[in-house]
Amino acid sequence: MTKENQIVLDERVKENQHLQEEEKLALDAVYLNQITYIKAHWHVWVPTNCHILLKALDSCFLNGDPLGKSKLSVILHVKCSEDYPQRKPAVDLLDPQGLSKEDVQNLLTILRQMADTWEGCVVIAELAHRVREFLTDHTPRPAGSFHDDMLANKVRTEAEKQRKRLDTEQKELELLEEEMRQRNAIEMEKTLNGTRQENETRIIGGRRIVVLSNMPNTQLLISEWTFRFSSNRNPAEGKRKDFAPFLQKLDAVYNEIQKLCEIKGLDQNLVEYAFVHLQKISVSPDQILIQLNVAQKIFSSEENMQDTYELIVQKSNLLRLLAAQAICGLRYLHEASMTHKHLTLGSVWTRNSTGDCVFRFSDFGSMGPLLDLVKMFGDICSGKYVARDEDKEKEYDRRRKDLFQLGTLLDGLILATRGSTYSRVPTPVEGNQNTGTNLLGNFIAKCQEAKNIDQLVEDPFLKEECQSESENIFTPFGGAMSPDGRMLADNVIIRVLGRGGFGDVVLVRNKMDSTDYAIKRIPLNAKSDKLNRKIAKEAKFFAKLNHPNMVRYYYAWAEDLIPIVEETSDDDSSLGAVPIPGKEKIGKKGKLKTGKSLEDKENKANLGGGDSLMPMNLRGLVKDHSIGVDAKEWSTPFGKPEGPKCASRMRQSKRSTPSGGLKHLSECSSDDEDDDDSSEIDWDAESEEVEDEESDDSDEEDEDDGERLVQLNTETSTGADSVFERSTADEDVVFTAESEDLNAKRRESIELMEINTTTTSKSKLAIDVVPVRKPRILCIQMEYCDRATLRQYIDENHCFNAPTEVWRIFSEVLCGLKYMHDMAMIHRDIKPLNIFLTSQNGVKIGDFGLATLEAMSSKGKIVGGAAEKSTSIEAMLSPNGVKSKGSDVHQTRDIGTQLYMAPELFVDELVHKAPYTSKIDIYSAGVVLFEMFYRPLPPSMDRVSTLNNLRDDIKIPSDFGAGLAAPMAGLARRTVEKMLQRNPDERPTADDLLNDEDLPMHTKEDATFRNLCEKVIKKRDGRMNAWLLDKQFKEEVPTSLNYCYDVDICLERAKYNNREVLVETLRAEFCKILKIHSFEKLHTHTLMPVSTALAAASVRTKPVEVLDRSGVPVALPMDLRQNFVRFCVRNSVQRMKRFNFGRVYSQTSANGHPHERWECCVDCIGPQCSSPSLEAELLLVACEMMIGSLPGMKFTLKIGHAQLIEAQIRHLKLSDDVRAELLDALHLISVSDRPHSHKEKMDMLTPKIGAKAANIITKLLIPVEDNFGAFKEKVACFRKKLKVDAARVLVDKAIRDLEEIVGTFKFCRTEAIEQISIVYDSQTCYRPRTFGDGLLFQIQVEKPSTIANNKRGRRQNVLAGGRYDSALLRERHPRDFVYEIPLCISGFGVAMDVVSQIRDSINKSANIPKTPQNHCKVLICSMVQPDGSNLITQKFELAKKLWSMGIEADVFHIPVDDLESLTEHRNRASITHILAVYNTLNEVICKTETSSETMDVDSAISSVWRGVQALDGQSIHMTPCGGGPISSISTPGEAHHHDDHHPGTPVIASKCFRSSVSTTVATTSIRPISATVANLNVILVTSADRFHKVMKEKKRVESQVRNHLTEFVAHFTSKTRIEVLVCDIPADVIKKIVSELTKTSSEAEIDKLFDQLIQKHGKVDLSPLRRQFHITLNGISTGSAQVAILFYRQSDNFYRYLV
């Protein structure tokens, strides 16, 4: 023991004594008269040894135990050692009183467990206190104990709390009600003022509205129901309440609402349920507390009718909408055998009550039962409940109640409106009630009397139009829908979906199938049948379309309208109410001087008196749209956007039309208006086109100015009672009042008209009355997309930073466009507003009002070409229609929506006459794609300028794709730029985009194809499966792919061919070591199932998966042990030690040849009880292999255990998914080429397991180097922190395994292996999917650093492995035989490519040739002959002789001009001799590195033989393998691995060896007498300071040398004296000595060599060997006997023979 260790030990003893003395003082203070110390010598310090008399704690009695009532006592005996508290004390119990033997034993067990737990800490006081607690627990409780008082006080306290709670309960309820009232008032104020914060929860009628963060634009309406009851103060008073019926009904209601939450495909007029939650907090008879939450989904823009009914009731058309949508919702419920049960004002929700007018109804099926439940609960609490059998209400009665409640709701809306101008007065019976218009009152009465909902569907009140123009049944087309027409007879009109220049689109519900449809209504010209046929062309086009991504067409028909002759001015008649006396009346319409009213004149124009088809109200919208300009999408005017006024003037100057004056007046006099104002369709331009086509009609040409002025008035005015008005944004229908400016303009127009009509009264057509004609409309019934438009979807931020959703929508849009373009059709108005989304996330293209045929298509491809040559409506109505040359198709340029129009549509048709193509749709789709990827743009000039920049300069904003990954953003930008090219020919087609492999689009066709392929693939024996595989294998591989597949690996092999040679050398060296340890070589099959490969896949690499002809997926091996495991379980192998060499494969990033690596796999399988010894031998073999293959390198052996990692995972309580990610991260840390800092580990682990867990695990167990004891102590400290028993068990097992493995390994390792540093790291992890059942180890070699100032190089992992028992269980099949004895399997793998690379680097740094010249190799060739002969016979005759002598020879078949041309081949192939046949006379040129001469064949062979002898003389230096010598000239490779010999069988020396010793022994094959071990003279060469130590082991060393050289000495004669110099110098030094010196070397040569070696190997002491070598050589020179000298290395039995 060193002096420092002694000092440390003394300090530790003093510290222990100090702690014991301090503990004694504490014990004396607590147990003064009850503790007795036992000492043998009072003046000498001894460890604590005491008796403590202990009794129960005094707190178990009220006043202590003065009378000694407690009879329980025991003496605690504690005996400590000198190392206490570092070592636990001995504990015993003496003289127990009042305790049974079982209690004493239990107490003693508890105390000893405490001593084990508290090891390292003072524990006597804790033991004594635990004894007193135990006695207290076993002391019987006497009367009047403190425990009884505590219970009594607790009862009194609880009673007082109950009384106070009951006293304050009523006050709390009152305060709660007041708070609710105040909260509702505040909510109402916030709603009206618009001051609500975003994401703030609202409360309406006691119900909360919560914003859903995960569902944008959606809120939850949560109804909270709390049932609370507490019994009276005195439980004995009153009868207990029976809540069993209530609880039973509560469960029934809950189940019913739960079923409502599961309904899919709910009607759009009903509010969907989100969830229902029931929480029974307390259900005892004295205490009831139950909470029930019912959640429904509402939109953020929806408001409850309780807040907005004042705005709704003032407009009769909104009441009609409410009634119609309520009928639709109730009809859905009734057809589904459900009822609403509580249709009140609070269950009605509306969106944009002054705009969109969508009503939805909540609480269906839930509010009624819940209210009944509340009533029942109140009756039970008040004692009024009487149990009775409730008759189940009939379905018929419940439906009637719903209808009655609907009528009550409508009636209440009228009566509850303050300041209403309506009076509930019965309508007179006489006369026509429809004209007297008490329709609402009749409808309400019918609701209260109807027996089923079908009676309400046919009510006249619902057949009135839901329009904004008037409070009557008039359409915006100058007539009223006929109640007997198909529109109203078959459908219920719900609401208007949108309006434009074509007409409008209404949402209807079919009475027969209860399905919603969208019906487009287009006015027909009562004057021109030809024009009507052109208008009907849209329906014909529409009927031809049938595609999942196109809005579906159902039916089309024409319907007559009821002509309007006179209007009433009673604004309220439609509500079924009579005017209240004193109410202000609206004045009559202005009269013309002819006596006709202005309204009559307007009707005349509408019904065909004028040439324009533009309805009156739409004309007002077109001309007066500047009132509310909105920078959204609009359709361009049919003049040029750059100058509409100039273009219109030019058109006016070219022709004179009835509307020409109007256009001149309206356009030229509006210079101050915005030039960008536009509308959907230029109806005046259409009229001009019609006039051009009907120019033969002389009556139309002779219309006078009076008629024009009348049309001026009709075009600039609209109905006075309009509440709907079209905004400039074509997707908006807004509710607004007429502006004062508009009224002023109308008044001015009327005055101007009166003046002009007066001055032109004498004209022949001034005020002629045109007979009234019945107006007609075209109705097109289409599919209704119930979700939204893409415009709304983008504005609600659903597409921003959602590339998957964007590409999905875009792909479906392209599918629809491809379908249209394949049918030679162009949409011409692609924009987000015309792209519709369905509830099933489908995407459909709609609005084909501007569709046309492609001019470049042939007639045979034109859809519907047999009908007429004309195409779409607008194409024929526009004055800019261009008829392409050689085509019957007219094209209109100035159509569509300006922001989405392609640049070629803005070019003047007079300059650019080429027809446009379907590429204009591609351009528009590109703008749509840009909007989906870009942030939502508000409807302002910012949006206009951004989209205009796309068209003008293709200028994409810099923040485009800011929230996307860089590759995705770049892909989106490139796609948009391609689609927005100004040149149409440079834009891709829809088919090009769909087939672009770079775009991540998944169309429905792709999904269908994938489903079909899955079915085919799953049916392996199917006909289609075989066909599919056959097509794949027969598919021709492109030439480029054929070339590129393996070009890289071919070049790499040629570049690093020398490493392949080193791999073969390593294989030979590894075989020698493994054979010594009795490992047998076992080749297993190559391919394996993919499941096996994936189960054991590495962290970074993936297996190479291939498909065989039968369709079975297989994989190439990622390591060589996976199939070995399958071999073992199939053959029930119990014991085996095997190794194998082979290539392993992994995937490459490119589509090329898999990545290949050489691997040496060593494994052993055996019983689990033998696992420590097997694993220790694996460690030993691994170290020997690495030291032998990389001599002189610095190695580090890292040892860990998988169960230590598992214990840490359980300590952190990580889930299975997180566990896998943690193991992968630890694997990357373990195989890293350098140590990681704490920060680097945190950065790698935090994303996997969180910052807290990462901080814990990085500081938990720090690696310990070369000290297993210290590592064991750290693990013990970690074990104390564990709270999970299973984790402690894992730690204990891991430490036991490591202790036994490391002990065996250290016992068996040699001196060379001792130089390897060992690091014990509990977080060592390697390929966790494979090695995860026990020992884990890695060997790292430190590569020299290439940086000058960096002394430490990078660590390279060259070998790793461990235990993998779970692989046996994973691969075992039920048919495999299983032994009763459990098995274990362990192994490791050597990265031979890495080892060869390092070895190559070492050779280069030491200037060692790539291929050592340790054998002779001959190249035979011939010189060029004059006759051109090849001398092939002479060359092979020469080669035959050399081959018979066992000399390696190669024939060069082509004659050469100059031997110098073979220099490169000679160096690469390591050729020693070149024999060139010179002529037919058998003259041969023999060329070596030093000479070149001409000789005959025999002389050449002799020269080669001498070279062989010279090389073999140097190569006779041998090393043992299996007990016998192996010539070092053996060619590396598998042929010389001696695998065919049984381990331990000596290998006979080769022929070359026998010939090489011919200089020493006789050449005859039979030796009469051979040398034995007695000829050996063993000399121990050592330094003076180690001489005595070595001499003690001389006999053991001599015995070792004789045992290993037994067979070697047999090759010498009996007279040969063999001097064996046993030394401990490195093997490479020995090799250098025997290669440079001989027995005849001079002393100067010897000293020179040894001086060089000493200078190069300064740390190696060569002086003793030099001295002994001189002595031995002097003895040889003086003696006459034959002497052989051997240099022998004791540590690894390495030896070399000196020639």
Curated annotation (Swiss-Prot):
InterPro entries reported in the protein's UniProt record: aa-tRNA-synth_II/BPL/LPL, CC_SR_Kinase, Kinase-like_dom_sf, Prot_kinase_dom, Protein_kinase_ATP_BS, RWD_dom, Ser/Thr_kinase_AS, UBQ-conjugating_enzyme/RWD
Domain RWD as annotated: residue spans: 22-138
Gene Ontology terms describing biological process: cellular homeostasis; cellular response to amino acid starvation; determination of adult lifespan; mitochondrial unfolded protein response; negative regulation of gene expression; negative regulation of translational initiation in response to stress; positive regulation of gene expression; positive regulation of nematode larval development
Species per Swiss-Prot/TrEMBL record: Caenorhabditis elegans
Polar residues bias (residue ranges): 711-720
Function: Serine/threonine-protein kinase which phosphorylates the alpha subunit of eukaryotic translation-initiation factor 2 (eIF2alpha), leading to its inactivation and thus to a rapid reduction of translational initiation and repression of global protein synthesis. Involved in the unfolded protein response (UPR) triggered by several stresses including mitochondrial, osmotic and oxidative stresses, amino acid deprivation and UV irradiation, probably by phosphorylating and inhibiting eIF2alpha.
Gene deletion effect: RNAi-mediated knockdown results in slower development and shortened lifespan when exposed to mitochondrial stress.
Region ranges (Disordered): 572-615, 632-725
Protein name: Eukaryotic translation initiation factor 2-alpha kinase gcn-2
Family annotation (SUPFAM superfamilies): Class II aaRS and biotin synthetases, Protein kinase-like (PK-like), UBC-like
CDD domains with a match to the protein in the record: RWD_GCN2 (cd23823)
Domain writeup: The protein kinase domain 1 is predicted to be catalytically inactive.
Origin: domain of life: Eukaryota
Keywords recorded for this protein, A-Z: ATP-binding, Kinase, Nucleotide-binding, Repeat, Serine/threonine-protein kinase, Stress response, Transferase, Translation regulation, Unfolded protein response
Family: Belongs to the protein kinase superfamily. Ser/Thr protein kinase family. GCN2 subfamily.
Catalytic reactions on record: L-seryl-[protein] + ATP = O-phospho-L-seryl-[protein] + ADP + H(+); L-threonyl-[protein] + ATP = O-phospho-L-threonyl-[protein] + ADP + H(+)
Active site: 829
EC number from the UniProt entry: 2.7.11.1
Top EC class, one word: transferase
A single cellular component GO annotation: nucleus
Binding site for ATP: 114-122, 154, 497-505, 520
UniProt feature, compositional bias: Acidic residues: 669-706
Record carries keyword Nucleotide-binding: yes
Domain (Protein kinase): residue spans on this chain: 108-507, 508-999
GO molecular function: ATP binding; eukaryotic translation initiation factor 2alpha kinase activity; protein serine kinase activity
